Amino acid sequence: MDWKEVLRRRLATPNTCPNKKKSEQELKDEEMDLFTKYYSEWKGGRKNTNEFYKTIPRFYYRLPAEDEVLLQKLREESRAVFLQRKSRELLDNEELQNLWFLLDKHQTPPMIGEEAMINYENFLKVGEKAGAKCKQFFTAKVFAKLLHTDSYGRISIMQFFNYVMRKVWLHQTRIGLSLYDVAGQGYLRESDLENYILELIPTLPQLDGLEKSFYSFYVCTAVRKFFFFLDPLRTGKIKIQDILACSFLDDLLELRDEELSKESQETNWFSAPSALRVYGQYLNLDKDHNGMLSKEELSRYGTATMTNVFLDRVFQECLTYDGEMDYKTYLDFVLALENRKEPAALQYIFKLLDIENKGYLNVFSLNYFFRAIQELMKIHGQDPVSFQDVKDEIFDMVKPKDPLKISLQDLINSNQGDTVTTILIDLNGFWTYENREALVANDSENSADLDDT
């Protein structure tokens, strides 16, 4: 066969015929079929050669997309059923009363004052009679955990019952919070926690006096405390476990007590007086009534002695709208200044002081902020204090690992972070620190005068 015949046959093949040229979609489909075929063969071969692949757990479960409505509904329904089942496993009020009756019946003499006690033998007897739901509480580990210094080897019935009550409450609360966990990943987003607190308000007698028009501001005030302290990386979500582990939820649910003292309400961030105080301060600062705070308006916060340099940094680093601060950003500012001993608050202020974004404060940073304090002292007719003296005092207080740099961890470890930050940002705070000995002496004299009378 000569080359002309070979060429003629080649040109006549269906693959090269213009009329039968494959479309782009057909080529993609063919490529996908081949990929699937070879991938399946390879996967099958690997599975047969290595049995360990059967025991490796699955690490990733894809969440349903927004357009996969059926999968979303199925996931929500299955989670609801699971949480209902978990809820039924908890002790109800009647079962708790029965447990208390059994414990009281099996107490082991002698009593210590009015404290009823129980030994391990009777402890196990109560566990057998209390039912399957209580089995998890009647273990040697729990008994040993509550065993202290009793010479008869007993534990307090009241302490054990409180332990059970606390465990039941934690599980109930976990289930309640999980109902708002839309993604089912063990986290609550800001909107999830807002919904939880909004639906919780009617169950808290101490909040009965709040007008419904204030609910949105109250919810914002409450939620910000959770996120400010529990979400330091600002991911927009916090673990349900972290919510349960901290005291904030206890403070919030304390508002169920109808006889809560005035002092307790004043120190509780979640109380109605506290929320109204914070919101009232915001309204008082907002002189132009546009719902936002400018730098000039914020400068009147507290004793109105914060430096302009510090306020400049606040508006440079914090989220603002056309150069003004909204209520949510203001709440972070208040939480930081009112809790300066806390690591989360120090992290907030440290970021503002770290003007070079180096992760530490050096002599330049300290001098940059203290110069503004010196200027305010001149304006108020006070003699400026030498920066060198203040700088030496700060480094002596903090005792950083590096003698020329102060890190955030150095501030936290020193337990002097609140004092150091106050010295650098607030004239009134610096004056209080500078005259601390005179103030202590004055307090002592006043105390002595009161004792004499």
Swiss-Prot record:
GO terms for biological process: B cell homeostasis; cortical cytoskeleton organization; microtubule cytoskeleton organization; positive regulation of B cell differentiation; regulation of antimicrobial humoral response; regulation of dephosphorylation; regulation of mitochondrial depolarization; spleen development. This is Serine/threonine-protein phosphatase 2A regulatory subunit B'' subunit gamma. One of its GO terms (molecular function) is metal ion binding. Keywords: Calcium, Cone-rod dystrophy, Cytoplasm, Deafness, Disease variant, Metal-binding, Nucleus, Repeat. One of its GO terms (cellular component) is nucleoplasm. It comes from Homo sapiens (Human). It is linked to Myoectodermal gonadal dysgenesis syndrome: An autosomal recessive disorder characterized by 46,XY complete gonadal dysgenesis and extragonadal anomalies, including typical facial gestalt, low birth weight, myopathy, rod and cone dystrophy, anal atresia, omphalocele, sensorineural hearing loss, dry and scaly skin, skeletal abnormalities, renal agenesis and neuromotor delay. Spermatogenic failure 36: An autosomal dominant infertility disorder due to teratozoospermia, with spermatozoa showing anomalies of the head, acrosome, and nucleus. InterPro entries: EF-hand-dom_pair (IPR011992), EF-hand_13 (IPR041534), EF_Hand_1_Ca_BS (IPR018247), PPP2R3C (IPR039865).
